[in-house]
């Protein structure tokens, strides 16, 4: 999404009387009495507070979980509601949306002690005389530990990575790297020239970072577009007027083909050891290419993704779901199937709503000085005028399929973490429901939504007749019209993870409140 975590915290400073402590990276929120649930049978307790930018968690036992702190690079072990120990301290670049972002345990844990982490490593900042080219291509395989940085240019080209660590009962030790992905974003370089982005600031967002193991034993990795405008963003020829026509480079590193520097906006599917499953949707296609681009395509499960902070596996069906953040228009909830093309940048929201997508993006000044799609080299005026035109522009890989979202919001409401409740502990009516948190504390101080799925677990069930089209036509940004029936809680702040605990209760991480909450049945 457009807002980096830094910008989010600035908004919070104004809106919620928050003090940011640079020396510790801690965020403290003015007390409002804490979050509440609309169902009187449900209650909330704080499991642990005073955490530093908590972002993700994984249970390793009853009342025992590993918790990631985005800005410190620390993996904290929390036992019985207190930090027991720091089991790993990575030296991260936490500028913008970078940092220590995602965790997944091997499906055979703890017999198989694998713990997988998505994080952003550090690099040497480029000299002021040549700021558009990073000093290093990638970090060393062995992770750097200790001190962190928020220097937005202090990253190698491929500074986002997924590594496997081993849990020995008290600490995490590095095992091996699975994949290294783009991190460096400084698109103000006049190479290629005259794309309109010469004055664009450096960025560090759209890194995705969510990890999940599927019922198939494969590791799914969410990686955002990192601001690229190439083939995996449905610009087959790069950032030309329509994305079609003579091929042009995406940036100073080349493109638009998905080589290592442009391999973004995807959900990857890997074996637990980091190798590529031969049943991936584009495995044969990539093998026939026999080059770097082909090797990357072999790893792809889905593409055309803008960015996402939420991905989860339905415990009942095994289906993969995600949320996708729009720019100003059409946040999404998606059922992700093999070979899915989610449509970005040509389409966001349902394809039939493309005219509304274009209207919103060309007229909105949502925290911006002028309408844009964040990367200035492909502006919103280039969006197609009709659904048919948008569909005709898509980058089509053999075996891919465009898919409309299962649910969307007309104006951005900024969903973040998603998670399924895999128990009846809150009551049978909530078993298997999808819970959705948000990445800004507006409206209602940070709402918590929940969705029922249909009997076949492939669609969103709705009770409100206004939602029969599975689009909430809210009136403006961060406004809840047509979402009233989805609301189940409020005042959670920025929700970065939602998990079912070993006791069956729902656990929710609030980044800005520095707290892990537990939702339980009280009556």
Language-model regions, residue ranges each:
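Residue position within the beta-strands of beta-propeller blades
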Residues: 67-68, 117-118, 221, 322-323, ...
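A short helix->beta-strand "capping" segment at the edge of beta-propeller domains
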Residues: 33-52, 172-175, 477-489
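Blade-level signature of beta-propeller repeat domains, shared across WD40, Kelch, NHL, RCC1
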Residues: 497-523
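Beta-propeller domain segments
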Residues: 33, 37, 72, 98-100, ...
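Beta-strand-rich domains and repeat architectures in extracellular enzymes and scaffolds
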Residues: 46-71, 413-420
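Blade-loop segments of beta-propeller domains
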Residues: 83-105
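Surface loop/turn motifs at the tips and blade-to-blade linkers of beta-strand repeat domains
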Residues: 46-52, 88-95, 179-181, 201-202, ...
């Amino acid at each position: 999404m457009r807002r980096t975590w830094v910008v989010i915290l600035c908004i919070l400073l104004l809106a919620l009387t928050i003090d940011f402590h640079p020396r510790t990276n801690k965020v403290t929120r003015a007390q409002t009495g804490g979050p509440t649930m609309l169902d009187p049978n449900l209650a909330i307790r704080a499991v642990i507070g005073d955490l530093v930018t908590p972002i993700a968690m994984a249970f390793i036992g009853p009342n025992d979980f590993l918790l990631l702190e985005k800005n410190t690079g620390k993996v904290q072990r929390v036992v019985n509601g207190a930090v027991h120990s720091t089991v790993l301290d990575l030296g991260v670049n936490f500028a913008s949306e970078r940092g220590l972002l995602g965790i997944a345990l091997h499906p055979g844990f703890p017999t198989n002690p694998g713990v997988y982490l998505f994080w952003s490593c550090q690099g040497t900042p480029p000299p002021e005389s040549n700021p558009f080219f990073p000093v290093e291509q990638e970090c060393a395989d062995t992770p750097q530990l200790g001190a962190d940085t928020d220097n937005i240019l202090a990253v190698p080209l491929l500074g986002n990575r997924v590594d496997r660590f081993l849990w020995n009962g008290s600490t995490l030790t590095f095992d091996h790297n699975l994949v290294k992905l783009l991190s460096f974003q400084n698109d103000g370089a006049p190479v290629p020239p005259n794309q309109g982005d010469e004055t664009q600031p450096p960025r560090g967002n759209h890194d995705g970072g969510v990890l999940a193991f599927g019922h198939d034993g494969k590791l799914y990795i969410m990686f955002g577009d990192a601001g690229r405008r190439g083939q995996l963003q449905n610009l087959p020829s790069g950032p030309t007027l329509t994305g079609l026509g003579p091929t042009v480079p995406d940036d100073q590193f080349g493109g638009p083909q998905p080589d290592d520097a442009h391999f973004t906006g995807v959900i990857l599917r890997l074996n637990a050891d980091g190798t590529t499953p031969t049943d991936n949707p584009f495995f044969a296609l990539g093998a026939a290419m026999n080059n770097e681009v082909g090797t990357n395509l072999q790893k792809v499960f889905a593409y055309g993704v803008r960015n996402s902070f939420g991905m989860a596996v339905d415990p009942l069906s095994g289906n993969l779901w995600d949320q996708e953040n729009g720019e100003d228009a059409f946040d999404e909830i998606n059922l992700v199937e093999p070979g899915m093309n989610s449509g970005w940048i040509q389409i966001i929201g349902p394809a039939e709503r493309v005219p509304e997508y274009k209207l919103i993006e060309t007229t909105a000044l949502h925290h911006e000085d002028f309408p844009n799609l964040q990367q200035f080299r492909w502006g919103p005026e280039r969006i197609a005028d009709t659904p048919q035109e948008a569909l005709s522009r898509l980058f089509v890989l053999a075996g891919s399929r465009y898919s409309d979202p299962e649910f969307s919001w007309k104006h951005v409401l900024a969903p973040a973490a998603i998670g399924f409740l895999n128990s009846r502990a809150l009551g049978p009516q909530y078993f298997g429901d999808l819970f959705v948190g948000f990445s800004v504390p507006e409206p209602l101080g940070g709402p918590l939504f929940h969705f029922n799925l249909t009997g076949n677990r492939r669609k969103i069930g709705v009770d409100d007749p206004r939602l029969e089209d599975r689009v909430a036509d809210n009136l403006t940004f961060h406004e809840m019209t047509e979402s009233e029936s989805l609301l189940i809680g409020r005042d959670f702040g920025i929700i970065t993870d939602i998990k079912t605990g070993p006791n069956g209760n729902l656990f929710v991480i609030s980044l800005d409140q520095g707290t892990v909450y537990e939702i339980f049945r009280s009556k």
